Amino acid sequence: FHRVMEAEGWADRPWEIVNDGEVTALAGSMSLKANAVLGISMGTSLAAGYVDPHGNIKPWLNELAFAPIDYRTDAPTDEWSGDQGCGVQYFSQQAVARLAPHAGIQLPPDMPFPEQLVEVQKLMETDDERAAAIYRTIGTCFGYAIAHYHSYYDFENLLILGRVTTGVGGESILA
């Protein structure tokens, strides 16, 4: 990176490398003209960023994908990290795919998560009660998680985005 900065003639310019979640939260803070923002993106995974009450991003990663929100002994285990009860299992396209069979939606087991999300979103547009149950479950869990996150983050504003929040399902999550 330093070589690129030098080669491009940018070596004298200030720069900072930060997580994309932090950039999103900072953009949200600037857009809202407010500080104390927790940004959450429900997409391929669960991404997060935080702007404190003074308008600063912190030097740590706000990686809530693997932060626990479900402390039950039988909480779902993330296949990648091995973490149990973590946010990615509740607020991502993985969550939709995990919940679909429980809601009675049978999709091919080898169907990639993004495609499963699209199928559930299509069902949601037709007022399918099974799809609605998935989004209500995500919304209920999200409400509890936000209260839990507030124990660690001093936020007054919440920025929610990502593929899972697209369309009617996203409205249901926030209802």
Segments and roles (model prediction):
Residues 6-9, 27-31, 36, 73-175:
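ATP-binding/phosphotransfer module of carbohydrate and carboxylate kinases, centering on a glycine-rich
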Residues 1-82:
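Phosphate-binding/catalytic loop of phosphoryl-transfer enzymes
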